[in-house]
């Protein structure tokens, strides 16, 4: 979950995303109840569903315009009842390009979500909630990259050809684009955005788990910035390269015997609630 690496360490990202969930199953499995119990006044709650609400499985399926909309209304109303601030997102695009009569892929993407894209926007307008058009953001990104290069964003590994779920690179890029759009609409969070070319994090919220891995993989040409997030790492690798600027969060400790450093106090929380593993969360 890459969102934490896009924000300062004043923001706690509490990720409640669960793969394969719809608004219906998220509620029925008591996942929403657990989020609601944790919300404090001033928390931001990011809500994005749709991919799994589309499925025919009766445990998952909802209808746009009726049950899907009603569940989104529930999330908004109950978040506000706890003093939280809901933010609605629609579904990111699937990497599905049109084929022409010659069997060749064009640069046009097929809409696989239909009216499920409209419900979050409709409820946001109805309830006066911030809406982030993740479908447009990711549509523009994938279309610009084209049929071949866009595979670099998704889980194309070996024989696996997954055009729905992002890999680490894709998740980092999409999270960065998403939080930039959030920052435009929510100035309080916009002030907390940080921009680095690469992030190292022990909890999987970055591009690499270790600084050593990052230094091995980063291209040598050009300048770049690297953020090392709070956590305990092995011995700090020797490093001399004036073109690479490394920033360490408070709470970074080096050396296999180093004790965990105490994490700094946070005063912003962000909670994410999502029905697939690409995006998810809750917040303060």
What do these predicted ranges mean?
Residues 1-17, 33-41, 254-284:
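Serine-esterase "nucleophile elbow" of acetyl-processing enzymes
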Residues 1-25, 218-232, 236-240:
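N-terminal, post-signal-peptide region of Sec/Tat-exported proteins
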Residues 15-21, 47-52, 89-93, 133-137, ...:
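Active-site-proximal beta-strand/loop segments in catalytic clefts of secreted hydrolases
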Residues 203-213, 222-253:
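N-terminal extracellular ligand-recognition/capping segment immediately after the signal peptide
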């Amino acid at each position: 979950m890459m969102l934490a690496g896009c924000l300062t360490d004043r923001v706690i990202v509490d990720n409640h995303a669960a793969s394969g969930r719809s608004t219906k199953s998220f509620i029925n499995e008591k996942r929403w109840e657990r989020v609601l119990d944790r919300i404090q006044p001033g928390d931001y709650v990011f809500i994005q569903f749709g991919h799994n609400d589309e499925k025919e499985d009766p445990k998952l399926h909802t209808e746009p315009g009726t049950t899907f909309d009603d569940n989104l209304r529930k999330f908004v109303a109950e978040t506000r009842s706890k003093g939280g601030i809901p933010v609605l997102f629609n579904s990111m695009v699937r990497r599905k390009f049109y084929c022409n009569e010659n069997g060749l892929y064009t640069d046009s993407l097929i809409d696989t979500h239909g009216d499920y894209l409209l419900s979050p926007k409709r409820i946001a307008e109805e309830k006066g909630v911030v809406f982030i058009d993740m479908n447009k953001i990711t549509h523009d990104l994938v279309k610009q990259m084209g049929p071949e290069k866009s595979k670099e964003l998704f889980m194309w590994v070996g024989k696996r050809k997954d055009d729905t779920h992002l890999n680490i690179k894709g998740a980092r890029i999409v999270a960065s684009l998403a939080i930039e759009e959030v920052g435009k609409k929510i100035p309080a969070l916009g002030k907390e955005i940080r921009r680095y070319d690469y992030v190292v994090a022990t909890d999987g919220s970055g591009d690499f788990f270790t600084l050593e891995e990052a230094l091995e993989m980063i291209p040598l040409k050009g300048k770049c910035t690297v953020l090392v997030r709070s956590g305990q790492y092995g011995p700090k690798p020797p490093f001399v390269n004036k073109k690479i600027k490394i920033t360490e969060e408070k709470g970074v400790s080096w050396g296999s015997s180093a004790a965990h450093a105490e994490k700094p106090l946070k005063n912003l929380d962000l909670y994410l609630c999502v029905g697939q593993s690409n995006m998810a969360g809750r917040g303060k």
